[in-house]
C-alpha cells in the first residue's frame, strides 16, 4: 500500500488569500497510476524563513464572537409544580433579565447583603419559546454554513444546564430537525452536481489529506456499509464486492477506478435502502434553498463523530465488533501544533441521508444516563464534524479544507444532586471540563484586553479545550448557543450559565493564522536573475503575468534543474537564516547573562548588608543579656557575703559572752582550783555553748514555721468575703433597732412626764374619769410599742443565733491556734532553760478570742405586776429600756 500525505493551501477559492505556497509532509512514495510522479517528488519538505508579511486584521477578523440565547418552553408537568415564577424574562431582542425567585440561593444571598436579586445580560440575539427550528436555523447557522462552503472553519457549541434543550437544538426530532440535519441538507442541496464521485482523497490529522488507492477505497466503503447495516461483518461485504467484480469481468467490462466506486456505491444504496429507510421522507423535499458556490470546484464531504466521556475520547462511528470494551482514542498534535484525534474514523458521505443515518448510529453508541433533572441525559461532550475538501481541476492540486463542527456539550448539574458513584464521577468530570473552558475564555478575553501582559491560556487542562484550541486561536471561528431552562428550581445554575456566556460574548475572533510564504515561482525567478543570465530573458518575459496566475501555476511547468537550483537557493537561505538566528540567540544569551550577573551581584550585596545588620542586632542583644547576668550574679554574691558577715558577728558576740562568763566564773571560783579543771570546765562550757547555739537555731526555725502557721490560721479566722454582706446587713439592722429603741425611750420619757403632770392634776381635780381615759390611751400606745419592740427583738434573736454559730466555728479555730501557740511556747521555754538555766515562766495570759465581741444583754425576771402603771413607773426609774413580759434570754 502506497500513500501520500498532503497539506492543503489556503488560496484556491479566493484571490485575496495570502497563503500561496503549500506545505508538504511526505511525498516520497510512488502513488501508482493515479497520482502524478512529478508532484514535487524530489523535495521532502518545502519551507522558508523569509520575512513574514504583516497581516493587518480586517473588520471581519475583529468581529466579536456570536452568542445566541434560546429559551425553551415549560412542560405541563413543570407548570403543575409551579416552576413558572417569572425568573427568566426577555426584555428585548438582545437583553435578558433574570429575577431571583424565592427559595433560590441568589435571593438568600441578596437578603444577607451579598449579590443582587436582578441581573441583566446582553446577547447577540435572543430567541423565545415560540421560535421554531427553521427560523432559528435561518437566523443563526445559515450564514455559518455559507462561510464553510467558502472555505472558513466554524465551531458551533451549545451550552446550558441539564434539560435545557441543547440536544434538541442540535439534532431536533424526525419531524422537526435541528441545526445539524438542516446544515447537512443545506450543504448537499448547495453542492448538487459538484460532489467528487470517488473518495480518493481522505482527510488526515488536522488539516491534511491522504491519497487512497483502490484497495483503501474499498475498505472505506466497507466500513461505511458495516456502520449503515448495523452489524454486517466486513467479510460478508468483501465477498459481495468480489462477486460483483467477477460478474463485471465476465460480461467484458473493464474494472476501472471510477467504475469500482460506482458499483460499490450502487451496492451500498441497495443495502441501506432496505434497512434504514425510516427517515427517507426527511430529505425528499428539503425546505432550504441552495447557496451559490463556484462552478469550477468539486467537493468531497467526510464526517466524523466522537465523544469525550470522563476525559476519555471514544469514536462513535467505530465499526461493530465482538469486543465489549470500547477503544479509547488519543489526542495528538501535528508538526504545526494543531490538535487532532488519532485513529478517528472519517466516513465519506454522498448525501444528507447517509450522514443522518450515521448520526443515528453514533447516537446509539453515545453515553446516556438518567439524572435528577433529565431521564435521558447525555453524559458526554459529543462533537460531530463535517469536513469538506475543495477540489479544483482534475484533482492534481492539493485541496483546500473547510470544517463545520457542532458540539453538544453535556449539561452542568450540581454534584450534590447525584446520588450514585458513577453519576457523581460523570458530573464532576463534566463540571471540571466546563470550568476549564470558562477559564480559557476568561484568559483569552484578558489577553485581548491587555495585550502588553499576556497570560497563559490553559488549553491543556482538559480534552475539550484542546479540541477547541484551533478555533479559538485563529484556525477558525466559534459560535455559542446558550440554552436556558426557565424553571425556578434551576435558577442558580441558569445564572451561572448566563455569567459564563457574558464572558464569551466579549471575545473577539482571532485573526487567521496565515504564514506569508512566498510562491515557488518567486524563488525560481529570483534565482534565475542571480545565477543564470540565460534565464533572465525568460524571467523578464514573464513579468507581465498576473501575480495570482503565478501563484496558481502548475509546478510541472518547471524543469528538474530549475527546481534543484531552487532547492540550493533555499538551502543557502536556510543556512543564512540559521546563522542569523544563532547570532541573535547568542546576543540574547549574553544580555540575559549580564542581567543575571547584575541581579546576582545586587542579591549578594543585599545579603551581606542584611547579615551585617543581623550581626549587630545579635551582638547588642547578647551584650544586654551579659550585663543582666553580671548584675544578678553580683547582687547574689553580695547578699551571700552580707549573710556570712552577720553570722560571723553573731558568733563573735556569743564567743565574747562566753569569755566574759568564763572570766567571771574564774574570779568567783576558788583560786586553789587546778588549772586542769578550769580547762575542762571551759571546754565543757564551749561545748554547751555550741549545743545551745544549735538548739537556738532550731528553735528559731520552728518559731518561723509556727509564726507562718499562725498567720495562716489568723487568715482563716478572718470572716470569708462571702459573709461580709451578711454581717453588713446585720449591723444595719442592729443600728436601726437601736435607733428605734432610742425613739421609744424618748416617747416613754414624754409619757412619763405626761403621767407626772396627770398625777399632779389628779391631786387638784376630781375628774377621775378623764385620768382613766388618759391611762387607757397610754396603755394602748404602750402595747403597740411593746409589739414593735417584740418584733425587733425577735429579729435580733435570729441574727444573734447566726452569730453564735459563727462564733462557735471561730472558737474551735481559736482553740487549735492556742494549742499550736502552747506547743511553740513550750519549745521556747525548753530552749531558754537549757541556755540560761532559769525557771519556767508562764506566758502572760491572753484574752479569749472574741470574748467581748457579742456582749449578752442582762436577763431580768418578768414582774408579777403587769399593770400599765407599774411599767410606766419602772421606765421612769431606769433610763435604759428593760425587757418586758415578751423578753427572752438569749
Curated annotation (Swiss-Prot):
Residues 763-890 are annotated as: Globular. Changing residue 528 to A: Impairs phosphorylation by PLK1 and recruitment of PLK1 to the spindle. The modification Phosphoserine is found at residues 7, 14, 21, 528, 532, 662, 668, 685, 825, 867, 878, 883. Keywords: Acetylation, ATP-binding, Cardiomyopathy, Coiled coil, Cytoplasm, Cytoskeleton, Disease variant, Golgi apparatus, Microtubule, Motor protein, Nucleotide-binding, Phosphoprotein, Protein transport, Transport. The modification N-acetylserine is found at residue 2. Its main location: Golgi. GO terms for cellular component: cleavage furrow; cytoplasm; Golgi apparatus; intercellular bridge; kinesin complex; microtubule; midbody; mitotic spindle. ATP binds at residues 160-167. Phosphorylated by PLK1 at Ser-528 during mitosis, creating a docking site for PLK1 and recruiting PLK1 at central spindle. Residues 64-507 form the Kinesin motor domain. It is found in: Golgi apparatus; Cytoplasm, Cytoskeleton, Spindle. Mitotic kinesin required for chromosome passenger complex (CPC)-mediated cytokinesis. Following phosphorylation by PLK1, involved in recruitment of PLK1 to the central spindle. Interacts with guanosine triphosphate (GTP)-bound forms of RAB6A and RAB6B. May act as a motor required for the retrograde RAB6 regulated transport of Golgi membranes and associated vesicles along microtubules. Has a microtubule plus end-directed motility. This is Kinesin-like protein KIF20A. It comes from Homo sapiens.
Amino acid at each position: 500500500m502506497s500513500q501520500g500525505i498532503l497539506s492543503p493551501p489556503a488560496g484556491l477559492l479566493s484571490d485575496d488569500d495570502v497563503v500561496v505556497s503549500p506545505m508538504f509532509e511526505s511525498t516520497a512514495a510512488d502513488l501508482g497510476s493515479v497520482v502524478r510522479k512529478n508532484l514535487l517528488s524530489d523535495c521532502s519538505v518545502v519551507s522558508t524563513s523569509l520575512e513574514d508579511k504583516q497581516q493587518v486584521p480586517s473588520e471581519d477578523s475583529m468581529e466579536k464572537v456570536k452568542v445566541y440565547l434560546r429559551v425553551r418552553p415549560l412542560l405541563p408537568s413543570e407548570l403543575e409544580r409551579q416552576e413558572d415564577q417569572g425568573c427568566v424574562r426577555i426584555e428585548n431582542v438582545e437583553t435578558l433579565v433574570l429575577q431571583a425567585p424565592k427559595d433560590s440561593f441568589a435571593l438568600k444571598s441578596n437578603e444577607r447583603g451579598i449579590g443582587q436579586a436582578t441581573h441583566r445580560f446582553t446577547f447577540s440575539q435572543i430567541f423565545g419559546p415560540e421560535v421554531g427550528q427553521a427560523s432559528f436555523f435561518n437566523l443563526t447557522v445559515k450564514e455559518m454554513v455559507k462561510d464553510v462552503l467558502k472555505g472558513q472553519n466554524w465551531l458551533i457549541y451549545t451550552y446550558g444546564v441539564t434539560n435545557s434543550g441543547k440536544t434538541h437544538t442540535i439534532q431536533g426530532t424526525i419531524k422537526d430537525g435541528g441545526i445539524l440535519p438542516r446544515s447537512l441538507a443545506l450543504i448537499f442541496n448547495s453542492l448538487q452536481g459538484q460532489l467528487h464521485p470517488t473518495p480518493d482523497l481522505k482527510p488526515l490529522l488536522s488539516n491534511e489529506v491522504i491519497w487512497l488507492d483502490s484497495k483503501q477505497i474499498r475498505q472505506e466503503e466497507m466500513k461505511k456499509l458495516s456502520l449503515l447495516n448495523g452489524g454486517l461483518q466486513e467479510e460478508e461485504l468483501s465477498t459481495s464486492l468480489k462477486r460483483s467484480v467477477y460478474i463485471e469481468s465476465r460480461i467484458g467490462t473493464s474494472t476501472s477506478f471510477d467504475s469500482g466506486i460506482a458499483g460499490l456505491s450502487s451496492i451500498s444504496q441497495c443495502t441501506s435502502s432496505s434497512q434504514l429507510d425510516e427517515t427517507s421522507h426527511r430529505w425528499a423535499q428539503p425546505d432550504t434553498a441552495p447557496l451559490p458556490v463556484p462552478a469550477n470546484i468539486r467537493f468531497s464531504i467526510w464526517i466524523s463523530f466522537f465523544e469525550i466521556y470522563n476525559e476519555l475520547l471514544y469514536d462513535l462511528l467505530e465499526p461493530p465488533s465482538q469486543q465489549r470494551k470500547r477503544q479509547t482514542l488519543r489526542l495528538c498534535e501535528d508538526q504545526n501544533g494543531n490538535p487532532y484525534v488519532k485513529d478517528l474514523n472519517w466516513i465519506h458521505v454522498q448525501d444528507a441521508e447517509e450522514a443522518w443515518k450515521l448520526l443515528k448510529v453514533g447516537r446509539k453508541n453515545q453515553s446516556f444516563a438518567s439524572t435528577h433533572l433529565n431521564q435521558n441525559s447525555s453524559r458526554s461532550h459529543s462533537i460531530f464534524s463535517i469536513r469538506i475538501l475543495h477540489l479544483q481541476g482534475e484533482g492534481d492540486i492539493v485541496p483546500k479544507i473547510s470544517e463545520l463542527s457542532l458540539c453538544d456539550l453535556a449539561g452542568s448539574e450540581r454534584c450534590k444532586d447525584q446520588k450514585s458513584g458513577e453519576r457523581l464521577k460523570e458530573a464532576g468530570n463534566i463540571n471540571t471540563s466546563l470550568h476549564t473552558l470558562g477559564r480559557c475564555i476568561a484568559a483569552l478575553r484578558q489577553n485581548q484586553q491587555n495585550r502588553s501582559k499576556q497570560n497563559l491560556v490553559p488549553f491543556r487542562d482538559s480534552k475539550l479545550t484542546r479540541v477547541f484550541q484551533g478555533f479559538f486561536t485563529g484556525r477558525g471561528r466559534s459560535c455559542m448557543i446558550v440554552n436556558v431552562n426557565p424553571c425556578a428550581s434551576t435558577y442558580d445554575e441558569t445564572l451561572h450559565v448566563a455569567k459564563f456566556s457574558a464572558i464569551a460574548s466579549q471575545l473577539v475572533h482571532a485573526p487567521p493564522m496565515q504564514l506569508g510564504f512566498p510562491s515557488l515561482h518567486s524563488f525560481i525567478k529570483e534565482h534565475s536573475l542571480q545565477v543564470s543570465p540565460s534565464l533572465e530573458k525568460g524571467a523578464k518575459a514573464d513579468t507581465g503575468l498576473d501575480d495570482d496566475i503565478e501563484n496558481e501555476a502548475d509546478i510541472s511547468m518547471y524543469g528538474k534543474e530549475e527546481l534543484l537550483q531552487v532547492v540550493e537557493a533555499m538551502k543557502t537561505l536556510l543556512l543564512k537564516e540559521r546563522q542569523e538566528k544563532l547570532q541573535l540567540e547568542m546576543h540574547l544569551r549574553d544580555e540575559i547573562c549580564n542581567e543575571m550577573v547584575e541581579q546576582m551581584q545586587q542579591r549578594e550585596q543585599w545579603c551581606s548588608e542584611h547579615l551585617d545588620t543581623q550581626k549587630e542586632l545579635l551582638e547588642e542583644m547578647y551584650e544586654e543579656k551579659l550585663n543582666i547576668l553580671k548584675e544578678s550574679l553580683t547582687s547574689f554574691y553580695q547578699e551571700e557575703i552580707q549573710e556570712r558577715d552577720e553570722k560571723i558577728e553573731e558568733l563573735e558576740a556569743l564567743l565574747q559572752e562566753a569569755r566574759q562568763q568564763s572570766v567571771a566564773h574564774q574570779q568567783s571560783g576558788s583560786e586553789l582550783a587546778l588549772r586542769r579543771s578550769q580547762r575542762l570546765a571551759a571546754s565543757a562550757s564551749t561545748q554547751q555553748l555550741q549545743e545551745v547555739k544549735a538548739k537556738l537555731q532550731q528553735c528559731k526555725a520552728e518559731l518561723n514555721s509556727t509564726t507562718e502557721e499562725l498567720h495562716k490560721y489568723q487568715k482563716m479566722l478572718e470572716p470569708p468575703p462571702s459573709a461580709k454582706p451578711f454581717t453588713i446587713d446585720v449591723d444595719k439592722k442592729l443600728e436601726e433597732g437601736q435607733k428605734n429603741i432610742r425613739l421609744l425611750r424618748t416617747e416613754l420619757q414624754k409619757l412619763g412626764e405626761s403621767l407626772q403632770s396627770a398625777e399632779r392634776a389628779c391631786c387638784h381635780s376630781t375628774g377621775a374619769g378623764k385620768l382613766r381615759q388618759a391611762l387607757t390611751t397610754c396603755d394602748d400606745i404602750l402595747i403597740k410599742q411593746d409589739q414593735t419592740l417584740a418584733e425587733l427583738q425577735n429579729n435580733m434573736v435570729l441574727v444573734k443565733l447566726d452569730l453564735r454559730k459563727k462564733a462557735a466555728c471561730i472558737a474551735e479555730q481559736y482553740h487549735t491556734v492556742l494549742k499550736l501557740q502552747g506547743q511553740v511556747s513550750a519549745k521556747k521555754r525548753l530552749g531558754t532553760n537549757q541556755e540560761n538555766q532559769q525557771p519556767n515562766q508562764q506566758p502572760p495570759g491572753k484574752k479569749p478570742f472574741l470574748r467581748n465581741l457579742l456582749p449578752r444583754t442582762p436577763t431580768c425576771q418578768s414582774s408579777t405586776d403587769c399593770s400599765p402603771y407599774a411599767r410606766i413607773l419602772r421606765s421612769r426609774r431606769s433610763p435604759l429600756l428593760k425587757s418586758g413580759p415578751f423578753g427572752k434570754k438569749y
